[in-house]
């Protein structure tokens, strides 16, 4: 017998995988969580530009326009666009009356 075989034998007997065909709820829950984590990580790496762009721009929406007439909305959009077009390198503050 080689030294390698003598060292491996007790480890294989003591620490062998005992979770094959296991119906232990903790093992099942850990497996499901692990698989979901792997799937979410893969999706995050594949679509991270789309996901983070959505959150970045989605959370920076302007004020609510509910109840505001369409003419005032259009005027506000034009003022915003003119401010952006006027100077792209400096911050422009628009005060609404």
UniProtKB/Swiss-Prot annotation:
The keyword Transmembrane helix applies. The record marks 37 as: Essential for channel activity, possibly by being protonated during channel activation, and by forming the channel gate and the selective filter. GO terms for molecular function: monoatomic ion channel activity; proton transmembrane transporter activity. Signal peptide: none annotated. Gene3D superfamilies: 6.10.250.1640. A lipid is attached at residue 50 (S-palmitoyl cysteine). Its main location: virion. It is found in: Virion membrane; Host apical cell membrane. Residues 60-88 are annotated as: Disordered. Glycans are attached at residue 20. It comes from the Viruses. The chain crosses the membrane at residues 23-43. GO terms for biological process: protein complex oligomerization; symbiont genome entry into host cell via pore formation in plasma membrane; symbiont-mediated suppression of host autophagy. Residues 71-80 have a biased composition (Basic and acidic residues). Pfam families: Flu_M2 (PF00599). When the channel is activated, one or more imidazole moieties of His-37 probably become bi-protonated. This is Matrix protein 2. The lineage of its organism: Viruses, Riboviria, Orthornavirae, Negarnaviricota, Polyploviricotina. The gene is M.
């Amino acid at each position: 017998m080689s030294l390698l075989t003598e060292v491996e034998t007790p480890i294989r007997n003591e620490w062998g995988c005992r979770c094959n065909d296991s119906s232990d709820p903790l093992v099942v829950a850990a497996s499901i969580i692990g698989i979901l984590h792997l799937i979410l990580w893969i999706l995050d790496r594949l679509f991270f530009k789309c996901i983070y762009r959505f959150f970045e721009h989605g959370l920076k929406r302007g004020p609510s326009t509910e109840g505001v007439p369409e003419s005032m909305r259009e005027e506000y959009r034009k003022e915003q666009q003119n401010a952006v077009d006027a100077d792209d390198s400096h911050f422009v503050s628009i005060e609404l009356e």
